[in-house]
């Protein structure tokens, strides 16, 4: 299983990398824009934060296949081994096919249906990123869509994997993992929610109080 953080906040990546067993960091144009840093400045800093073995994801901005391929090559030259995120449009599918031939690893992003995700995988994307909460927000069933996509990839594109994205709660992320997803990416607030469980803190305080009442200190 691969766990990613969905952010361009270098300080938070450095902090959480000491806590979570993260495989890397995913970004998108909105996330990079929120950082107020040039993508060419922030990507090397993020790569340094996750280490050489960590995988970094960044997205193209062009709307046409030719431009996507050119931008993907530029990203790959700047950060060797980067996974290039390509929106799964008609032009995006063409770009994914071309980049597969170039040996550049891609992720099909902005996936709102299982059929759309399957096409990205068949075109050559290693990762496919369904938008779970955004599907829910549009009146759909994000988890069911992920379940369908996971089954389709297992049967028809086993070399590709679902990297589920767009979460508002830890429950959504866990449901994707229960559906068989091999990778998820968490926004910082959801990652923090997984750590902040009041009942855990209450239990620890009870252990400490019982120990102190018995032995007069908190030493082992």
From Swiss-Prot:
Positions in coiled-coil regions: none
The EC number(s) this enzyme carries: 4.1.2.-
Family annotation (InterPro entries): Aldolase_TIM, F6P_aldolase, TAL/FSA, Transaldolase_3B/F6P_aldolase, Transaldolase_AS, TSA/FSA_arc/bac
Pfam families tied to this protein: TAL_FSA
Principal cellular location given in the protein's record: cytoplasm
Molecular function terms, GO-annotated: fructose 6-phosphate aldolase activity
An annotated GO BP: fructose metabolic process
Active site residues of this protein: 85
CDD domains named among the record's database cross-references: Transaldolase_FSA (cd00956)
GO cellular component: cytoplasm
Keyword terms of this UniProt record: Carbohydrate metabolism, Cytoplasm, Lyase, Schiff base
Catalytic activity from the UniProt record: beta-D-fructose 6-phosphate = dihydroxyacetone + D-glyceraldehyde 3-phosphate
Subcellular location field: Cytoplasm
Function field: Catalyzes the reversible formation of fructose 6-phosphate from dihydroxyacetone and D-glyceraldehyde 3-phosphate via an aldolization reaction.
Similarity-based family: Belongs to the transaldolase family. Type 3A subfamily.
HAMAP family reported for this sequence: F6P_aldolase (MF_00496)
Quaternary state and interactors: Homodecamer.
Entry protein name: Fructose-6-phosphate aldolase
Species of origin: Salmonella heidelberg (strain SL476)
